[in-house]
Swiss-Prot record:
Glycyl lysine isopeptide (Lys-Gly) (interchain with G-Cter in SUMO1) cross-link site: 53
Sites bearing N6-acetyllysine, chain numbering: 32-33, 40, 236
Catalytic activities: ATP + H2O = ADP + phosphate + H(+)
Oligomer and partners: Identified in the spliceosome C complex. Component of a ribonucleoprotein complex containing mRNAs and RNA-binding proteins including DDX5, HNRNPH2 and SRSF1 as well as splicing regulator ARVCF. Interacts with RBM4; the interaction occurs in an RNA-independent manner. Interacts with AGO1 and AGO2. Interacts with ESR1, AR, EP300, CREBBP, POLR2A, TP53, RUNX2 and HDAC1. Self-associates. Interacts with DDX17. Interacts with BRDT. The large PER complex involved in the repression of transcriptional termination is composed of at least PER2, CDK9, DDX5, DHX9, NCBP1 and POLR2A (active).
UniProt protein name: Probable ATP-dependent RNA helicase DDX5
Amino acid sequence: MSGYSSDRDRGRDRGFGAPRFGGSRAGPLSGKKFGNPGEKLVKKKWNLDELPKFEKNFYQEHPDLARRTAQEVETYRRSKEITVRGHNCPKPVLNFYEANFPANVMDVIARQNFTEPTAIQAQGWPVALSGLDMVGVAQTGSGKTLSYLLPAIVHINHQPFLERGDGPICLVLAPTRELAQQVQQVAAEYCRACRLKSTCIYGGAPKGPQIRDLERGVEICIATPGRLIDFLECGKTNLRRTTYLVLDEADRMLDMGFEPQIRKIVDQIRPDRQTLMWSATWPKEVRQLAEDFLKDYIHINIGALELSANHNILQIVDVCHDVEKDEKLIRLMEEIMSEKENKTIVFVETKRRCDELTRKMRRDGWPAMGIHGDKSQQERDWVLNEFKHGKAPILIATDVASRGLDVEDVKFVINYDYPNSSEDYIHRIGRTARSTKTGTAYTFFTPNNIKQVSDLISVLREANQAINPKLLQLVEDRGSGRSRGRGGMKDDRRDRYSAGKRGGFNTFRDRENYDRGYSSLLKRDFGAKTQNGVYSAANYTNGSFGSNFVSAGIQTSFRTGNPTGTYQNGYDSTQQYGSNVPNMHNGMNQQAYAYPATAAAPMIGYPMPTGYSQ
């Protein structure tokens, strides 16, 4: 097939001459850990006339694409909910061969059994291959990574070979270590096929191997802002050769406070570069960043122009009090874990809550592990590996894992604590229903979250989801000022919470109160509510989950044609977990968790690697 040829195909030798374009060979790493990151970096004063010229437009429109009429293009864009803004935007490619990627790239695509480009790939590839700046706004799991990596490979193949002292040609900035590593995993397979080198640099890991990769020369560098600035300041790499810049999850990087570091980094890159910015949302802060960094860019939006969730996700909201969450979570897990393939992520608000909930669930026999920002990189990698391979199918996480965590077969997301914004809510639930799969998201929504209720209802309505009548009641109560008074759902037990906690396993369901029979009290209360119709199949007006949620279990059909229709209870499982779980071992060399058909003897402690808190 036709592809992109370049002088790289002629096998030029990679010499070891003097550093080009101002490459640095500075001394050892600085030991300074505090202060203003990037304060040693001086903003470059670029003279484009003195810089080597480079190519960035390599797009060859396929004959099949050229014959496609404007009406056919518009029909395709409407069917895929593609909205384009900007001048001279190329037509979308409907098939992989229309992108004219090199044969070795097409071979990898064939091995991965992809059938057709996703919407963002179909429209993004022609734009990126044309050398244009672009902004891509699409939901999580939509194929954004390949949208910029494959054009990056074509771009690199048309540039001169790296020489000693040269920095990367393609720089991908990512907000978290996990996302950077996942991008590197995707890049590695394509780079091997194309005889290119890539590396991933991030904090929390030894600097030595990362420095050696940079010194040997890499065409693609995937980096978190902090570690990259560290290496730039001490001269271990430079960005003089960088002509293809990617800002992945730009909204998340701004949320995490990386804007000053991003600006310091971009100041080190020549201004005539090609820049691609990717985001799941389009707030004003991201718009401002695009105006500052991009020139005459094409804006591609997939899905609704406003804040929207993946329509393949069934969203179920339970309006409750904080002290009710633990019992509700256990009942949910009893139903979910009746199928061993049901990987589940439970999102919590704080690191402390993450540790507490993980310890309690493990003591009760659940195969759960926790991940948050205070974990070491080695421990985070180990936990994610256990989760991905099904050895610990329950992951309890803070928002550190809500973006960029790419595990294909996550079936359920549970928002134990509602996040601070609807954007974070959308990113959290986006961990399920990756690509074209479906998934389910449960959310515990309390009166403490009332400021978010209107935004949540908007997200649910946009996705054609059933809306819990209690959410609508909260809106009315908020408007009348009753949400904290007698007329609303005031939590009259807030004074019992310890400092920094709102419910959780360290309030009513701590070990002492649990042994005294509080669990039985809650179960009796739940049974009474069921008999009185609160959780009944016939009437959801005062209930918890689902719309027309057929009582054959969570995996059954859910019809959202009537957003205010009858709710039916999906908790028909009578299997009891808690301490009645068979012996289970976990570890790198142990077999996966065996899911019993019947209850068995109490389990022994769930073994962890050295240094992991029980």
